[in-house]
Amino acid sequence: CYLTFDDGPSDNTLLILEILRKYGIKATFFVINSEKLDYVKNIYEAGHTVGLHSATHNYGEIYKSTQAYLDDLKVISDRVESIIGIAPKVMRFPGGSSNSVSRKYCAGVMSSLTRAVEELGYSYYDWNVSSGDALSETPSFTYIRNNVLKGARDKNSACVLMHDSDTKTTTVKALPEIIEGLMKMGYSFEPITPEAYGYHHNTLN
C-alpha cells in the first residue's frame, strides 16, 4: 500500500510525520511551492519519498499548454532540490492525469503531458483509492476513514490519495484508524519510487 499526500507541506505535515513514525511507515508527499516548503527536509530526512506536484496548482495557468506545466514543474523541482539536494523524479499531476478541467484551457494537454514528463525522465502516479478529503468543506474523519478502507478492500495493491494542506485536520485525525484498518487487511506500506507500479488513469482531455 502506498499512502500519498498532495498539496503540502502545511501546518499538518509534522503531525502526519509523527503518526507515520509511530507506526513505522514510509509514505509519499507530492508537494507544492507552499509557505512551509522547508518541511520537505523533514519529510526527506524521515525516509519518505518527496514527489513533485506543482508550484502554483493554478489549473488555468499550468494547463494552458504543455510547456506551461513543464515550466511550473521545473520551478517546484528547483525549489525542492535547493532544500534536499536532489531533484525528485516522481510526480503527480494536479487533479490526476484523468482530470477533465484541463480541457477547458487546452484540449488534449494531458495526453501531451503524460508523454512529455516521461520523456524528461519522470514517473507519474495517480491513485486507485481516494479518501474524498478534497471536498471544499472539511469532511468528517469517519467519512475519510471509511472511503479509504472501503476503497482498499479486495485490492491486491492500493495507492491512497490524501491531502496535506492546512485545512485537512480531519485527514490527520483519520490517519491512525486508516493505517490500523489497512494493516488488518494485510497491507504493508512502502514509499513510491520510480520503479514502483505506475497507477495511471485514462486521460480525459
Report the location of each language-model feature.
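Catalytic domains of cell-wall/extracellular-matrix polysaccharide-remodeling enzymes
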Residues: L15, Y59-L161, S165-M183, Y187-S188, ...
